[in-house]
Amino acid sequence: MKQALLIMAAMTTLAAPAMADEALAKAKNCMACHAVDKKLVGPAYQDVAKKYAGKSADELAKSIKAGGSGKWGPVPMPAQTALSDADAKTLATWILGGAK
């Protein structure tokens, strides 16, 4: 029983950061246009992770904050000027990790 509790505690600790980053994406309304595994208005986070594979979280964070058009189709992503640099990097790190 004690071993099972330790395993569950370890799993909860490991899962918490991903949950927090998904919660941040929801709180900042990113999930209104993006989903983890399917295209909505914008690309799926898993597709973004593939496209940005090998690039830094800072580079993706900069792209998130700046917005842009033509990268993923005809619908532009608006600049996320209200998003802090720290939150942009947190989201970028989560996305590059496969949004898990």
Regions found by a protein language model. Give the residues of each.
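Axial heme c-ligation environment in periplasmic c-type cytochrome domains
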Residues: 32, 40-50, 65-93, 98
